[in-house]
UniProtKB/Swiss-Prot annotation:
Known partners and oligomeric status: Homodimer. Heterodimer.
Name the UniProt record assigns to this protein: UDP-glucose 4-epimerase 4
Organism: Arabidopsis thaliana (Mouse-ear cress)
Gene coding for it: UGE4
Annotated keywords: Carbohydrate metabolism, Cell wall biogenesis/degradation, Cytoplasm, Galactose metabolism, Golgi apparatus, Isomerase, NAD
Cofactor(s) needed: NAD(+)
Gene ablation phenotype (knockout): Root epidermal bulging. Partially deficient in cell wall arabinogalactan-protein (AGP). Abnormal trichoblast cell wall. Uge2 and uge4 double mutant displays a reduction in rosette and root growth, hypocotyl elongation, and secondary hypocotyl thickening.
Length: 348
């Protein structure tokens, strides 16, 4: 299927990398983003990287909760499918500000689904998260593993998964794929697009890169008393380009008339500790990272990594990059863009 694709949150980290892959694949791509946690600079760079395909990109600054504005976007283009990345994603912030997360993530998604249905667009790829597995009793996590929202953020992902299942059950014309991805890291090999979180980062690798370029004094290691090989948490880190490719495979799978509502893990199937990841980044950058060991964060699980067999079998997708390539590309992005998409610490 090559057609018109709407990408919500397309100016963000994962969204921008996926938009580039869509353009290179020949898709006409429309991005909507409220730019609360992202920058239009990323979209301009995507356009540049896409070369001649960049002319097939349109951008609207729209909040998904603004139904009239969303209706206008849908009235201008007949979409074949939607990729839904938009949403807030910081576990710690969600614990402190649960209503912000429920309002932003749930209402936005419900509004999107309503407008899609009204315009006869019933194909959706939804960005879920491995956070729905909570603190798993067994690893690797399969798509059938027990689910548990350990934070308001995690619960929004769980709720949206249930909403998607209910929507498809109520109207079998819907085809929905929900992608539970693990820990996205790295950047496009060009060094032109990457992760640029607003404020102090919540995730490991953007935090690491801000320490290395001198924007933060040290890296806080949250929890060093886990029952893992070095006491730090274990995660399944996946290169953002692999993740973007997984979304393209999911989009193509929506051509399957029998898909219904399906869920797939996107990860490498390998667990890496926080300290192992820090060591790999030090090797890639040639820099020493000052560490400060602090207590565990509420809502953080000990060990989480994916079983990827279902995605390999049904989506014909497999992660290609290891942590060395992830850190190499992350450092390439960080060293070329020490202030992200801005030109100074205070610019956006």
């Amino acid at each position: 299927m090559v057609g018109n694709i709407l990408v919500t949150g397309g100016a963000g980290y994962i969204g921008s990398h996926t938009v580039l892959q869509l353009l290179l694949g020949g898709y006409n791509t429309v991005v909507i983003d409220n730019l609360d946690n992202s920058s239009l600079v990323s979209i301009q760079r995507v356009k540049d990287l896409a070369g001649d395909h960049g002319q097939n990109l349109t951008v609207h600054q729209v909040d998904l909760r603004d139904k009239p504005a969303l209706e206008k976007v849908f009235s201008e283009t007949k979409f074949d499918a939607v990729m839904h990345f938009a949403g807030l994603k910081a576990v710690g912030e969600s614990v402190a500000k649960p209503l912000l997360y429920y309002n932003n993530n749930l209402i936005a998604t419900i509004t999107l689904l309503e407008v899609m249905a009204a315009h006869g667009c019933k194909k959706l790829v939804f960005s879920s998260s491995a956070t729905v597995y909570g603190w798993p009793k067994e690893v690797p996590c399969t798509e059938e593993s027990p689910l548990s929202g350990m934070s308001p953020y995690g619960r929004t992902k769980l709720f949206i998964e249930d909403i998607c299942r209910d929507v498809q059950r109520g109207d079998p014309e819907w085809r929905i794929i929900m992608l539970r991805y693990f820990n996205p890291v790295g950047a496009h090999p060009s060094g032109r697009i990457g992760e640029d979180p607003c404020g102090t980062p919540n995730n490991l690798m953007p935090y690491v890169q801000q320490v290395v370029v001198g924007r933060l004094p040290n890296l806080k290691i949250y929890g060093t008393d886990y029952t893992t090989k070095d006491g730090t948490g274990v995660r399944d880190y996946i290169h953002v380009v692999d993740l973007a490719d997984g979304h393209i495979c999911a989009l193509q799978k929506l051509d399957d008339t029998e898909i219904g509502c399906e869920v797939y893990n996107l990860g490498t199937g390998k667990g890496t500790t926080v300290l192992e990841m820090v060591d790999a980044f030090e090797k890639a950058s040639g820099m020493k990272i000052p560490l400060v060991k602090v207590g565990r964060r509420p809502g953080d699980a000990e060990t989480v990594y994916a079983s990827t067999e279902k995605a390999e079998r049904e989506l014909n997708w497999k992660a290609n990059f290891g942590i060395e390539e992830m850190c190499r590309d992350q450092w390439n992005w960080a060293s070329n863009n020490p202030f992200g998409y801005g030109s100074s610490p205070n610019s956006t």
